[in-house]
Amino acid sequence: MKLGDWKFCLLLFQLMFLTNVCLSDLSFNPYKWPVNQLRRVIGAVKVTNTSNYFGFSLYENLNSNGNVFISPYSLASVMAMLYLGARGVTKNEMDLTLGYNSVNLNSEDLVLGFQQSLLLLNAESKEYQLETANSLMIQNTFNILDNYKRMLEDKFGANVQDVDFINKAELVQRYINAWVAFKTKNKIPILLNEPLKPETRLAFFNAVYFKGVWETKFDSALTRRATFYNNGYVPTQVPMMMLRGIFPFAYVSSLRSYVLELPYKGHEVSMLLLLPKDRNGISDLERDLSSSSLDSVTSNLREIGVLVTIPKFKLEETYEDDLKQSLESMGMTSLFSEANANLEGITGHRDLFVTKITHRTLIEVNEEGTEASGISSVVAGVRSGWKRPTFTADHPFVFFIRHNRSGIILFMGRVSQL
């Protein structure tokens, strides 16, 4: 086959450790905002809603019986960059799958919304470390439309690099792995175990890193080995952390689950944990849980003294073939079809389709926080006469990392086996 006859390959990668995003402080009068500022904020709210919707849909379709850990925001970010180049049937399918049509999110407001969230996402904070980055690598003999390139650079802050996938594949592989390692503080040191195929013409990357510390840290002296029931049935011994304190908490009868919020320092970001009352109740919880029901649940949490027992855990997940299959089952089929993909908005021609999409995540939760470093002393003794509610996560549970002001779900996952 001649090179000119090939449908060129486009690859998408999302790399993350953890992330946080914050939107504008909406306390001032919106009627006095410039129109463009108002559109950015409205766009950012719609980006939040669609990102959360997409995350829940993908979580449901991954249909894994083991651990799950995904970043809805990271996936939504890279899919948005791709969507802006989609046309025809491919665009319509992405509209439905990503939820854009349900909130009337057009391309211009999508760009403004992501621009707004990215500006604040990368704002400096003394309470946590955060980095996020977008990158697009282009075969140096390949042409993309100038307006598309400028949009990614100006609105998404993407670093656009010319590379040689054809003649210097191994060098490009090393460059990509070095970029990934740098952006994730070496938490994900290698993405590519082998060079990309020579027919690759574009590769999108999104990398995010978050390092947070609990507002109230667990006392490591209280951590002990205890039983966790893998998949709700199989007992195993794991390190369990203990903490007594006042936290937002509730029992939700409609979900037959306990809900607990553990804030990170600064209270801008929290971990939400949903624990089924029944040891094998995770499937029922996931069936009844949605983005809207989560919002309803968290709005009804009340601060109360709780004895918390949760496992230390580390999850490292990679999604590739199963991610592609899930997106196709959700309705995004033409994007991966050599015959039917339409990404004319990227090149001006129908010469691209997606051959590979990779989503890699890593999270570590310990006494200090989420991949926190350093040692601190915390007074968190447990009284023998404690009569307050308990939250004992000794069987499968669902968790979310959420930005509290915006409501955006940064990460979501299931701890099923340790």
Swiss-Prot record:
Q: In which tissues is it expressed?
A: Expressed in hemocytes (at protein level).
Subcellular location(s) of the protein: Secreted
Enumerate the Pfam families for this protein.
Serpin (PF00079)
Q: What is the lineage of its organism?
A: Eukaryota, Metazoa, Ecdysozoa, Arthropoda, Chelicerata
A Gene Ontology BP annotation from the UniProt entry: negative regulation of serine-type endopeptidase activity
Q: How is it modified after translation?
A: N-glycosylated.
Q: Which residues form the signal peptide?
A: 1-24
Q: Which residues are glycosylated?
A: 49, 404
Q: What is this protein called?
A: Intracellular coagulation inhibitor 1
